[in-house]
């Protein structure tokens, strides 16, 4: 049983682990547990994967009337969700429960620990999420994306890196050039703010476009689905605008630098691909964990961070141009990013899961 979701940062590690298990042991039953209100409610049925969706959503951490109302509704839904998880565990008798974080993983992890089912947690962020902080100590094992996670937990962890899709570091610059109709010989900036896009990033890059065009610098720009219609008219021969990019491996292969939010999974993919980055952490992420993720990359010399409060078109342009003009620095940052990458993380995690499951 693999439980996790709510956002792509928790769902896609679960899918990567599940795919690796299935590829290596096709007769193994992999069942996903998520939330009716998370991204997984769309993705799991689309992929035809065995799954159960729980009627729970995330805990709201503000004290607005709307948040209080949602939290009261959450409390009322927990008993039903708990019964559903218990029933699922009775019928499945899982050899191991894997939690990849997010509110969808909390109840399966709790039941697994309580019923003495081997239960492991995969934590993506430098600062561990609430579910990990609650259950790390009684869990069988914690597999962490970075060593920084140990600072915040009173238990031993295994630093494995984060599981990324196996194909992510096998992209082709030539294929990317053809796919996005851009010149593989030109410098290319890849800007994206996650699947939903980032309004501050989308806004800040617009005044920079003339300078990029004048210098022959290309921009591959994922706007987010909701922002695409308002921005698509800005496309030109050197600016390619997409609402959402599925072919991330080829996009990474084409890119010389990425301008992105600082979600753990994004940073793991950039590291595996050895791409220097300019990071804009989402300031309202829980416990400001994206800033902590970004700081890990900055300390290693793999990235430059601009806080959202400090973001302007001027300093974004200065940072992009400064890096692209400094080949030595760009190369060094790429090498440092690659040194952080753990392309075998998924394999290592699954090796450990098999050992736990087999006792």
In which residue ranges do the predicted regions lie?
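Active-site-proximal region of nucleotide-activated glycan assembly enzymes
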Residues: 31, 50, 113-174
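Conserved donor-binding/catalytic loop of nucleotide-activated donor transferases
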Residues: 115, 253-255, 271-280, 300
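A short, well-ordered alpha-helix in the C-terminal region of glycosyltransferases
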Residues: 329-343
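Conserved nucleotide-sugar phosphate-binding/catalytic loop shared by glycosyltransferases and other
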Residues: 2-7, 27-80, 309
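Acidic donor-binding loop of glycosyltransferase active sites
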Residues: 94-96, 240, 253-268, 275-276
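Donor-nucleotide binding loops and adjacent catalytic segments primarily
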Residues: 43, 47, 173-260, 291-295, ...
